[in-house]
Amino acid sequence: MTQVAKKILVTCALPYANGSIHLGHMLEHIQADVWVRYQRMRGHEVNFICADDAHGTPIMLKAQQLGITPEQMIGEMSQEHQTDFAGFNISYDNYHSTHSDENRELSELIYTRLKENGFIKNRTISQLYDPEKGMFLPDRFVKGTCPKCKSADQYGDNCEVCGATYSPTELIEPKSVVSGATPVMRDSEHFFFDLPSFSEMLQAWTRSGALQEQVANKMQEWFESGLQQWDISRDAPYFGFEIPNAPGKYFYVWLDAPIGYMGSFKNLCDKRGDTTSFEEYWKKDSDAELYHFIGKDIVYFHSLFWPAMLEGSHFRKPTNLFVHGYVTVNGAKMSKSRGTFIKASTWLKHFDADSLRYYYTAKLSSRIDDIDLNLEDFVQRVNADIVNKVVNLASRNAGFINKRFDGVLAAELADPQLYKTFTDAAVVIGEAWESREFGKAIREIMALADVANRYVDEQAPWVVAKQEGRDADLQAICSMGINLFRVLMTYLKPVLPTLSERVEAFLNSELNWDAIEQPLLGHKVNTFKALYNRIDMKQVEALVEASKEEVKAAAAPVTGPLADFPIQETITFDDFAKVDLRVALIENAEFVEGSDKLLRLTLDLGGEKRNVFSGIRSAYPDPQALIGRQTVMVANLAPRKMRFGVSEGMVMAAGPGGKDIFLLSPDDGAKPGQQVK
């Protein structure tokens, strides 16, 4: 059963260092950890790394609001993140930060190689500048009066009243969102990565058959829309790395973020005193395998920019991207008001890590499907599978072995053919773990657990124990049950690390994939102790209530949003009543050719279709992720003819702009076409 050992480097997407880890994050880290633990069990050389994504304007501004330095903020956040991941037994070999010497050196190296190879272009662009803060202002850090319809308090890229798009320089009486000052125009030289030069290479990589079908199909849509040059620079002040020989210019966060994978691995190699592995893993002709586990919202960056950057700087490309969907709770988006926006640390105060690891694993597949954490089903499944089927198998047999036979198992198997059925399943279960068909693996294992429990039911050791002269039969039956339990727990070891440690202590033997062919015969086990406790809905209720209380505590008066976006002048009810807000279903979402800001949305109002252009592309780089969501739109705006077509309304969104735009969604039960009052 031993395989040829492979060298594998596995990463998870880097959590942004301005917020806590929640159950949505944990899906990816659990998925990757289960896969990594399986690879290690099969004897492969696996390096599992991650880091905090620690750069960008949001980090800089939040640190200012907190009255601390960005370095202090990201340092505290890193400790919190690492504590959360350790609590869930995520077995990282290294957890680093993009704000590191290794990442700076590698970012500069890759940039220099791209520049030397002709893939960096310089272009002067005009931007608004905040004279008080001394900073250039992104489009959504400027507000003013719309030059088209004269509506006040509109962003610098498009009007949310009439739907017009424009440049920030066209705003009437523009104001800086950061300081309230009147901005001035300044030219600035920016640096662009020539992504279109890599179109053929990327298309060949897409057609290689390695990528998930859904990812390959989405990439094909992007190719058909045409790849654009990518602005990789930002002007000071900016928290990040300064571009070599370009004072006051900084690498955009999405340039150095994926390089953080390399930086974390370099840091690990340096800690080990390993001077060869970094080159072996990252050189262009490396025979090591490189896998990125990511969410579907960042496919654009990882499938286009990242492999192109690596190709242009003579490093190897990823072997594959393993993309997953989002997490919903009880069939809906995680909600702070309902207490279902649950932080990782809050979960661990009410449940153990293995319970969530098992539930997520049972629902995961290799497809990019959303996973629903139904809290009632969670309780039922954990109790039914882990407690009733698996742990109960051990408890039903261990007592007899401990009390009647001093913990010593029988010298022979009671049913060798049944045992072979269990060990033969290693092929199917192993293939399921390998291909990330986790749900299939769990189904196969639980089917075996049912067989094992039926065996015990039929043999009835509690009856045999009362019959004189049948001690050998009793020992054989219970030893068989414990050996079947051992095989099941070996298959489950990648999923349930804490339970596995307890089981290994009881069995007095390590759970090793390649050792299951040899049962434990004449082997002494330790005294059986309770391995896992049942859970109940009272714990769920306490968890939800605790999450609500955390939201209330965090909702104490703050100055940030209200200071940045003061409440506007009072309007009459009659003024408000003129605005017809409706629930709309997003039937389709796509890029707008010729615009780097707009998405074209096809909205269903419950029988009537609308075409709407919305300036939300910066926050939703994968429009496909919006399809099927409900949102709120202004339905009675006069249609406006734009360069790209006619816009028939406006969708509602919150946030300061850039990556921080959040499309509004109605609560559960709302239907397309219903009026929002």
UniProtKB/Swiss-Prot annotation:
Residues the record lists as binding ATP: K336
GO terms of biological process kind: methionyl-tRNA aminoacylation
Any coiled-coil regions, as ranges: none
InterPro entries: aa-tRNA-synth_I_CS, Anticodon_Met, Met-tRNA-synth_bsu_C, Met-tRNA_ligase_1, Met-tRNA_synth, Methionyl/Leucyl_tRNA_Synth, MetRS_core, MetRS_Zn
CDD domains registered for this protein in UniProt: Anticodon_Ia_Met, MetRS_core, tRNA_bind_EcMetRS_like
Protein name: Methionine--tRNA ligase
Keyword Acetylation: no
Binding site for Zn(2+): C146, C149, C159, C162
Superkingdom of the organism of origin: Bacteria
Localization: Cytoplasm
Upper taxonomic lineage: Bacteria, Pseudomonadati, Pseudomonadota, Gammaproteobacteria, Enterobacterales
Quaternary context: Homodimer.
Motif mapping: 'HIGH' region: 15-25
Intervals of motif 'KMSKS' region: 333-337
Reactions catalysed: tRNA(Met) + L-methionine + ATP = L-methionyl-tRNA(Met) + AMP + diphosphate
